[in-house]
Swiss-Prot record:
Gene source species: Influenza A virus (strain A/Turkey/Ontario/6118/1968 H8N4)
Protein name per the record: Protein PA-X
Location (main, coarse): host cell
Known role: Plays a major role in the shutoff of the host protein expression by cleaving mRNAs probably via an endonuclease activity. This host shutoff allows the virus to escape from the host antiviral response. Hijacks host RNA splicing machinery to selectively target host RNAs containing introns for destruction. This may explain the preferential degradation of RNAs that have undergone co- or post-transcriptional processing.
GO terms of biological process kind: viral RNA genome replication; viral translational frameshifting
Site entry: Important for efficient shutoff activity: 202-203, 206
Length: 252
C-alpha cells in the first residue's frame, strides 16, 4: 500500500500526509491504510477548491486557466494540510475578519462566498452513516458537511452541495479511479476491512519488497489545485502556486 500511495498521489500531498501522521506519532510505513486515507482526503480538499474564485463583484466563477487573473480571489481557504498551530491561526483570523462563529474542531476549508467553514469527508462506508458521525462529532449547524464515497455517492448539509455538478464529478471520478486501481492490485479489501488490514499488515511486515509492476516514475497533468499553503493574509502570493497532478495511477 505504501508504494501504491507514493506512486499514485502528488509528492506534495504525500509529504503533507507524512507530516500530519508524524505530528500525531503515527508511522506511514506501518499504518499504510491511514496513510492512503489521509492522502485521499487531502486530494479531495484541494480538488474542492481547484479553479474556484470570486470576482470583483463578489460572484463565484470558475477559471481553468493556469494563470488566473490577479484581481480574482480564491473562493476557498484551505485549512486542511497545515500544522495545527497555523491552522488555528488561520481559523481565528477568518473568524475575526468575518465574524463567523469559531468552530470547536478544525474544519477543512472556509468558503468566502458562502461565509461558512466546510468539513469534507471521504468514506469507504455508507455516506449517510459517515455523515451522521461527522454531525454528531461537530455538533454545530454553522459548519457545513460534505461527504463523498468511493462509489460516487455524496451527502451534504441540507442537500447544499456548494460546488457545480462538473466540479463534483471530477472528485467522484478520481475517487472511483483510486478504488479501481487499489482493487486491481489486491489492496481494496484491506483498505475497507480492518480485519483484512491486520492480515495484510502482517504480510507486509514480512516482505518489504516493492509492489510488482509499479513504475518508479509517474507522468504529471498540471493543475492549479495544490497552492502553497500560506496564511490567508498572504493571499496575493498564492497564485504563484505549486503545480500538481491528480494522477490516474499507472496500470500494471
Amino acid at each position: 500500500m505504501e508504494d501504491f500511495v507514493r506512486q499514485c498521489f502528488n509528492p506534495m500531498i504525500v509529504e503533507l500526509a507524512e507530516k500530519a501522521m508524524k505530528e500525531y506519532g503515527e508511522d506511514p510505513k506501518i499504518e499504510t491504510n491511514k496513510f492512503a486515507a489521509i492522502c485521499t482526503h487531502l486530494e479531495v480538499c484541494f480538488m474542492y477548491s481547484d479553479f474556484h474564485f470570486i470576482d470583483e463583484r463578489g460572484e463565484s466563477i470558475i477559471v481553468e486557466s493556469g494563470d488566473p487573473n490577479a484581481l480574482l480571489k480564491h473562493r476557498f481557504e484551505i485549512i486542511e494540510g497545515r500544522d495545527r498551530t497555523m491552522a488555528w491561526t488561520v481559523v481565528n483570523s477568518i473568524c475575526n475578519t468575518t465574524g463567523v462563529e469559531k468552530p470547536k474542531f478544525l474544519p477543512d476549508l472556509y468558503d468566502y462566498k458562502g461565509n461558512r467553514f466546510i468539513e469534507i469527508g471521504v468514506t469507504r462506508r455508507e455516506v449517510h452513516i459517515y455523515y451522521l458521525e461527522k454531525a454528531n462529532k461537530i455538533k454545530s449547524e454553522k459548519t457545513h458537511i460534505h461527504i463523498f464515497s468511493f462509489t460516487g455517492e455524496e451527502m451534504a448539509t441540507k442537500a447544499d452541495y456548494t460546488l457545480d455538478e462538473e466540479s463534483r464529478a471530477r472528485i467522484k471520478t478520481r475517487l472511483f479511479t483510486i478504488r479501481q486501481e487499489m482493487a486491481s492490485r489486491g489492496l481494496w479489501d484491506s483498505f475497507v476491512s480492518p480485519r483484512e488490514a491486520k492480515r495484510q499488515l502482517k504480510k507486509d511486515l514480512k516482505s518489504q519488497e516493492q509492489c510488482a509492476g509499479l513504475p518508479t516514475k509517474v507522468s504529471h497533468r498540471t493543475s492549479p489545485a495544490l497552492k502553497t499553503l500560506e496564511p490567508m493574509w498572504m493571499d496575493s502570493n498564492r497564485t504563484a502556486a505549486l503545480k500538481a497532478s491528480f494522477l490516474k495511477c499507472p496500470k500494471k
